[in-house]
């Protein structure tokens, strides 16, 4: 090889020359700007780096498994019967197998988010370049999850690339452990699941800060505009384009084309699932009204298609029904897929002319097309929508049954109840069919909101009744009135908001953060979300929402005719209701907790995961609720919260994830921590007494929310406020005083002021506490001391004597 020499050359006379410089050999890395930043002990942790922390919390919060079957079918040695403590051919037992199953769910969810992030980041770098600056609003901590886990403080799109490579590497290593003949211990499968959950929050954060920075989304904006939501907000008389999925990359070109051609008032543009939320965020950074409407969640997909309203459907990725193409083609609705994760067997038309594609789709020669060229898609989708609207009208495409057909369907029901057995929520379909036969639509109108439109009832029906169609036809009146408001996703919580509220959260005077996240698999419709949020907002909790929960919360109105978004401020403060955005914006919720530790407590967060998780568990009153969780992504989001010390409550369907993390409050030794001031042991309250659990009803969950926000660091005012809510919610929803309320009392000033004397009497008579009645003071009885200067920690190394 010849030796390289120095020299010069000129390109001034050359045309069409492009020079690309990647990494310059010997150049000082840009991160040298942060050379003085102190790094924690776990920068870019591997699978085993935080194992000690995981084992620490798993020692208190024990895994509880609820297997769906006793078999393992992973390899050709099997299937193996693991019941009765038997081992499979590879040596694994039922505990280990179920831990492995849960871990697989978690890393599947993490892969979905990081795959989304990789696709989106690649797309945005192609449009804006690696040097495009990151801007998420008023903050010095742009990416708290990224910084906490990797130590990287990203400033440009290019900085996110290496972090995402780290995420992808970790997911690969975790997936390798799933293979037969690898890990065998349940506790280490659990540790790996927790690692996958943590990694998921990094992947989500990358996805959202990239799109916020490039697509003119609101940036930590508490005054983000309101968007229309609901099937009733669509004007069915116009050509209608519906987008389904979670990745907004393809849709932005459609919105731009429609705006450039003056089509905003001529075409209805609506979305389902998180793409809908991100469509409303696009180009609303200046508080411009959204250009799109939100139709609803996954539970509205089949309903929307069966309505016949869409003229064209675009899908991207995640939470999309596998039968969209089949259902849409019945009604002559072309489907365009835009992402390699969902292709439906369609031909790739990315290199074909728009005219040829229009010809094939409008004539019905093809049911749909695969399109990776988003600029071409931007023109194709609106033009196709307008053409298909006319064609479908001319052909008289009929979707829902007529009134006469509806009566015939109801009369054909034999009331075998097979539909109700198949229904995930056991909805009273047979009773509604009887009422419909008598001309009463009200029973089905009630079922419309509760039906998740999974379609299982139709496959169970021996009379082949399209039950979803019956529900929707019977509910046309309520559907037409289904018009709500949802706050456009505001993005992260700003530094000024954290500075203002951090001290109140740690001391307990703001009783806590309640995060309503996750999917739409609710046991009793969307009203449950309204009930939860309204109750906690009235009690001055901070309520943060995202994804499907954020959408469905806007579907219900109170007696005043307003949604909660219209009643409560969108600021991170006591009594605030914040919509952070789509699924990937969940990272901003954990990010806010991390920022509390950094900004209020002045903790170093760079590569310092264990200490911040310890701080969260002991000091920050926060609880997550995934009331309708259904997906693997919901499992990974919740597990990431668990590792960070944030407890999560799932709805009744959450037991199908097959694993919970539940502590035993009566094991007093498990409820001791160190006081970092001197290393001495201190007793703490048994709260939270789970990191992941399920609740059967809203009534059961309500007092759990208040209890889950109690922390050892509460001052007397904070503990009094939290204990008041815990006791009142238990009495309101369960009709009883909580059995363990007295265990959270350290001194008389912890007691609710209005009931202090009555409660002191109960403490004396029923629990044997000694009371000085003259001064109304507790002399003896509490197992914990009130010491607001105490510094509770699970980590011995953080104690001063260490």
Curated annotation (Swiss-Prot):
User: Which sites bind [4Fe-4S] cluster 2?
Assistant: 72, 75, 80, 90
Identify the enzyme class: oxidoreductase
The 4Fe-4S ferredoxin-type domain extends over 404-432, 442-473
Q: How is the cofactor bound?
A: Binds 7 [4Fe-4S] clusters per heterotetramer. Binds 2 [Ni-4Fe-4S] clusters per heterotetramer.
Which GO terms of the molecular function aspect are on file?
A: 4 iron, 4 sulfur cluster binding; anaerobic carbon-monoxide dehydrogenase activity; hydroxylamine reductase activity; iron ion binding; nickel cation binding; peroxidase activity
For the ligand ([4Fe-4S] cluster 1), the binding residues are 69, 73
Task: Supply the Gene3D superfamilies for this chain.
Answer: 3.30.70.20, 3.40.50.2030, Carbon monoxide dehydrogenase alpha subunit. Chain M, domain 1
Reaction catalysed?
CO + 2 oxidized [2Fe-2S]-[ferredoxin] + H2O = 2 reduced [2Fe-2S]-[ferredoxin] + CO2 + 2 H(+)
Free-text note regarding domains:
Cluster B is an all-cysteinyl-liganded 4Fe-4S cluster; cluster C is a mixed Ni-Fe-S cluster which is the active site of CO oxidation. Cluster D is also an all-cysteinyl-liganded 4Fe-4S cluster that bridges the two subunits of the CODH dimer. Contains two additional 4Fe-4S clusters, dubbed E and F, that probably transport electrons from ferredoxin to the B cluster.
Q: What does this protein do, in the record's words? A: Part of the ACDS complex that catalyzes the reversible cleavage of acetyl-CoA, allowing growth on acetate as sole source of carbon and energy. The alpha-epsilon subcomponent functions as a carbon monoxide dehydrogenase.
Protein family membership: Belongs to the Ni-containing carbon monoxide dehydrogenase family.
Q: What's the protein here called?
A: Acetyl-CoA decarbonylase/synthase complex subunit alpha
- Biological source species: Methanococcoides burtonii (strain DSM 6242 / NBRC 107633 / OCM 468 / ACE-M)
